[in-house]
């Protein structure tokens, strides 16, 4: 059998090879026209380097399937390398929204409320309708009686140094009277300690009527202005040589009997310095009576201060004649030192920041920059510890129903950045007055550089107002509230705003006037209901005179006389 010749020969027919499979259309363009008639296929163009590497990698992976076990590790390594090349500076920072009440937004609230506030044509005037709370059981009356008869022989002399401002010194005076009476000692007129903050060198007689003070207490406590010569000779006429007791704050009266009286009997003179808040509020009734007698009856401002104060009261009543001779007094604490001490942030920008840093260093020298001390202005504001600004006081009073024509007496020191911060308050209450506006320069000249004497004038005008508004804690409003209760049948006639609630309301620029006014009227009503309160064991008798210093008008009460002599 002849083998078939695979090579073509001329004139011979041979079986043709099987037909080649049709080439995919995607590869048809690879055959050139020159080779179209050729029987031999043309050589394919070489693959690219990327194709070769891909085929090599794929073939390795298919032959070595165990490599897939390392795929997660390879993936993580690649991701770490990638992340190392990315800059995270461009990642957006999500800032948390400040908690409600932590930011000062009162100017925005004022701008939002002012059109509606000015358009409010309510006819009711708060000053004539504010006090509606009825006295449960009837009104109260003062019942501090003076003792009769001669005093027993004195156990010695007590000399105290009263530090602080006007009303902190007042606390020391009244407590010294109580301690001297309890120990059957003779009280030396208290010495006022000069303080760099208050910068007032005034003596007792410059502020109070010394003669009236001594005579009012004459049947209960001996009071002298000097120590006998024979005693001072023992100490070389130097009070620093006298034995000094450093008494703990809020010490009970028994401490004075057990620890101080023996030394007093031995030395016949002792010194207590400092003496601010050195006697607890919880004391026997006989001791409380002496406190009441000293504070509400014996302490009267000097004739010059009292005369000017009463003159300003008369002028305020004359100006407010169309309001029934009634005016509102506001104790505003927005002086530079108060703003600095609070550590709150307002709207004064960088200038305010620099001013406050300088004021803190000037007044407290490093107290606020100690290592580890953290100051959180937002939390301070939320807790109601920031002093109210003049703008906030104006918004609050307008919301409480005091209209634009209300007469306001502003008791304050030098307001921080007054030209800017006082402008909104004057817009809301154009009939606002201060002692500097009511009195002439000649009338104020003797008191100008004495902060305690100026505070005494403010105290007098506030005492006789129909409404007293306190905007910040402190001795001034606490004493004034107690004194007003003593004068007005047990009711303080005082507005004490809820500053925590105010912080939240003033942090809402979207609040409407009706909603804001409703909240303020509720706050006013709450102050009315709290106007009359009985003293609790740890309350100050200088703020809550009932029932230790007062009795019901429909009851006859004979208070306890002087305490028995301590021996």
Curated annotation (Swiss-Prot):
It is found in: Golgi apparatus membrane. GO terms for biological process: cell adhesion; cell wall organization; fucose metabolic process; protein glycosylation. Signal peptide: none annotated. Its main location: Golgi. Residues 87-567 are lumenal. Residues 1-65 are cytoplasmic. It comes from the Eukaryota. Substrate binds at residues 331-333. Residues 1-41 are annotated as: Disordered. Keywords: Carbohydrate metabolism, Cell adhesion, Cell wall biogenesis/degradation, Fucose metabolism, Glycoprotein, Glycosyltransferase, Golgi apparatus, Membrane, Signal-anchor, Transferase, Transmembrane, Transmembrane helix. This is Protein ESMERALDA 1.
């Amino acid at each position: 059998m002849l083998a078939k010749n695979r090579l073509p020969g001329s004139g011979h027919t041979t079986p043709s090879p099987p037909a080649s499979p049709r080439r995919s259309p995607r590869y048809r363009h690879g055959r050139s026209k020159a080779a179209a008639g050729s029987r031999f296929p043309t050589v394919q163009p070489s693959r690219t380097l990327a194709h070769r590497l891909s085929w090599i990698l794929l073939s390795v992976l298919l032959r070595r399937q165990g490599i897939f076990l390392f795929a997660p590790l390879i993936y993580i390594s690649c991701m770490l390398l990638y992340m190392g090349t990315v800059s995270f500076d461009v990642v957006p920072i999500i800032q948390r929204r400040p908690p409600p009440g932590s930011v000062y937004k009162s100017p925005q609230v004022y701008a939002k409320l002012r059109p509606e506030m000015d358009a409010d044509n309510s006819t009711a005037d708060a000053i004539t309708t504010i006090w509606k709370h009825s006295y449960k059981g009837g009104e109260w009356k003062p019942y501090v009686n003076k003792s009769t008869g001669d005093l027993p022989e004195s156990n010695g002399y007590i000399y105290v140094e009263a530090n602080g401002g006007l009303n902190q010194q007042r606390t020391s005076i009244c407590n010294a009277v109580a301690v001297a009476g309890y120990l059957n000692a003779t009280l030396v007129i208290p010495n006022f300690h000069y303080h760099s903050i208050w910068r007032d060198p005034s003596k007792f007689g410059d502020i109070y009527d010394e003669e009236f003070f001594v005579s009012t207490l004459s049947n209960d406590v001996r009071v002298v202005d000097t120590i006998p010569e024979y005693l001072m000779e023992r100490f070389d006429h130097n009070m620093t040589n006298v034995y000094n007791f450093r008494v703990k704050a809020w010490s009970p009266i028994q401490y004075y009997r057990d620890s101080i009286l023996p030394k007093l009997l031995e030395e016949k003179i002792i010194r207590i310095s400092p003496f601010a808040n050195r006697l607890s509020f919880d004391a026997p009734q006989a001791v409380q009576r002496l406190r009441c007698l000293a504070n509400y009856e014996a302490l009267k401002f000097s004739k010059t201060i009292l005369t000017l104060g009463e003159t300003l009261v008369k002028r305020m009543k004359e100006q407010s004649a169309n309001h029934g001779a009634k005016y509102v007094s506001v104790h505003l604490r927005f002086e530079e030192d108060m703003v600095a001490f609070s550590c709150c942030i307002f709207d004064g920008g960088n200038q305010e920041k620099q001013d406050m840093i300088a004021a803190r260093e000037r007044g407290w020298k490093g107290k606020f920059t100690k290592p580890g001390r953290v100051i959180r202005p937002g939390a301070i504001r939320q807790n109601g510890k920031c002093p109210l600004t003049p703008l906030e006081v104006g918004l609050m009073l307008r919301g409480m129903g005091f209209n634009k024509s209300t007469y306001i007496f502003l008791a304050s020191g030098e307001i921080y950045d007054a030209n800017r911060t006082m402008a909104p308050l004057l817009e809301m209450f154009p009939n606002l007055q201060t002692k500097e506006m009511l009195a002439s320069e000649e009338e104020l000249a003797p008191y100008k550089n004495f902060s305690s004497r100026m505070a005494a004038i403010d105290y007098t005008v506030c005492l006789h107002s129909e409404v007293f508004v306190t905007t910040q804690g402190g001795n001034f409003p606490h004493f004034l509230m107690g004194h007003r209760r003593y004068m007005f049948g047990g009711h303080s006639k005082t507005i004490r705003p809820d500053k925590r609630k105010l912080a939240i309301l003033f942090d809402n620029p979207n609040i409407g006037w009706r909603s804001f006014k409703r909240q303020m009227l509720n706050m006013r009503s709450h102050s009315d209901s709290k106007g009359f309160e009985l003293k609790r064991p740890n309350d100050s008798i200088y703020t809550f005179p009932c029932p230790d210093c007062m009795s019901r008008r429909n009851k006859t009460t004979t208070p306890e006389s002087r305490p028995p002599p301590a021996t």
